[in-house]
């Protein structure tokens, strides 16, 4: 039976990424679909391009050739064209003309005038997201953060790896952003995946009315529930919303018997070094009972720093170092000793902490 909120096959919705061969978003090999839009404002968000529900632009100055086409195309005058900057370049050269009796060559510093061009500057307050600068840029320096897609287009991408799901016990995960922010889209996608025989998972903050979650349960195999912090005051400070609704929904999910994994981002200044946090998570997991299949510890990583730069945003955690498995052994022990659930530590796959 269709929900009145469910979208139809002809409608478009924004997708920031379809990540194939994902191994961090549920069991097995998976394809993760990232939807755009989220009611939370997590200060460390590693997908900041997914926060706003409308399309935006990435500006990568490393790819910019300073041609100025973007500024010429902007009808709002929101882009300052590349600026010529005169400077000096210093270089060291060896002086081969030694003084009488001197055998060593002397290094001398020389200066030469050079001309550089600073990249264009985008005034995000003037920008109306008309995307004309995206069309004008031929070098990929200015791009859209998301693509408008239909249900069938997403299904085609996801179903193309169906063989790998079956051999690895994987499937499709809907993430974001917050997929519950788009209940009709999420419901329609889950229904299509299940009709195709693809296992489903939902990566969510749990911040939505229970009725929204309840509509999805029939088509869900697993819920990946993010637990940022169980201290409500901290939760409001760092995410912009209370965690009361999230905890209530976790308990109601457990009552239905739906399997879930609790996912714990460990973030500097928020919950790192705070060992009361894993103890509180253990207490919650015990309340949730057999529904908790596992608990995944997710160490902070700085990948979103460059994304925020390309979005023209300030990033609170700029310069903070990555966390690694060895940084979180105390967390792991508390959680592993706290119950029968599986415990994993995620993070940057294949990257080891420098010695």
Predicted regions and their residues:
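Conserved AdoMet/S-adenosylmethionine-binding subsite of the radical SAM
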Residues: 152-310
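ATP/adenylate-binding site constellation spanning eukaryotic-like Ser/Thr protein kinases
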Residues: 35, 47, 76, 139, ...
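Conserved Radical SAM active-site core
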Residues: 53-219
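Auxiliary Fe-S-binding modules of radical SAM enzymes
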Residues: 1-25, 268-355
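N-terminal pre-triad scaffold of radical SAM enzymes
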Residues: 16-69, 119-129
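Generic domain-boundary/flexible-linker signal
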Residues: 44, 53-56, 183, 273, ...
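Short glycine-enriched, charge-decorated loop/helix-capping segments at active-site entrances
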Residues: 59, 236-242, 312-320
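Residues that scaffold the ATP/ADP-binding catalytic core of kinase and kinase-like folds
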Residues: 41-45, 73, 82, 136, ...
């Amino acid at each position: 039976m269709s929900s009145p909120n469910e979208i139809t096959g002809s409608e478009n919705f924004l997708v920031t990424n379809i990540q194939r061969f994902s191994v961090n978003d549920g069991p097995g090999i998976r394809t993760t679909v990232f939807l755009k839009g989220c009611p939370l404002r997590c200060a460390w968000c590693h997908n900041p391009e997914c926060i706003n529900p409308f399309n935006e632009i990435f500006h990568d100055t490393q790819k910019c050739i300073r041609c100025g086409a973007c500024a010429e195309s902007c009808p709002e005058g929101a882009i300052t064209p590349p600026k010529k900057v005169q400077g000096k370049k210093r270089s060291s050269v060896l002086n081969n003309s030694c003084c009488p009796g001197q055998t060593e060559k002397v290094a001398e510093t020389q200066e030469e005038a050079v001309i550089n061009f600073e990249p264009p500057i985008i005034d995000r307050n003037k920008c109306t997201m008309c995307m004309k600068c995206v069309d004008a840029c031929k070098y990929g320096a200015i791009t859209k953060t998301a693509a408008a897609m239909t249900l069938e287009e997403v299904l085609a991408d996801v179903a193309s790896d169906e063989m790998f799901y079956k051999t690895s016990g994987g499937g499709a995960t809907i993430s974001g952003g917050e997929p519950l922010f788009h209940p009709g889209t999420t419901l329609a996608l889950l229904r299509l995946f299940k009709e195709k025989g693809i296992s489903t998972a939902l990566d969510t903050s749990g911040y939505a009315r229970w009725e929204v979650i309840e509509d999805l349960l029939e088509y869900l195999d697993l819920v990946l529930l993010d637990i940022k912090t169980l201290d409500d005051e901290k939760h409001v400070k760092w995410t912009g919303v209370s965690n009361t609704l999230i905890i209530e929904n976790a308990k109601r999910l457990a009552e239905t018997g739906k399997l879930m994994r609790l996912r714990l981002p460990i973030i500097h200044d928020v919950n790192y070094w705070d060992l009361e946090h894993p103890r509180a998570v253990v207490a919650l997991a015990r309340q949730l009972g057999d529904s908790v299949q596992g608990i995944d510890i997710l160490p902070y990583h700085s990948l979103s720093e460059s994304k925020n730069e390309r979005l023209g945003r300030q990033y609170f955690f700029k310069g903070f170092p990555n966390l690694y498995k060895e940084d979180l052994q105390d967390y792991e022990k508390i959680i592993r000793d706290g119950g029968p659930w599986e415990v994993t530590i995620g993070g940057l796959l294949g990257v080891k902490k420098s010695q």
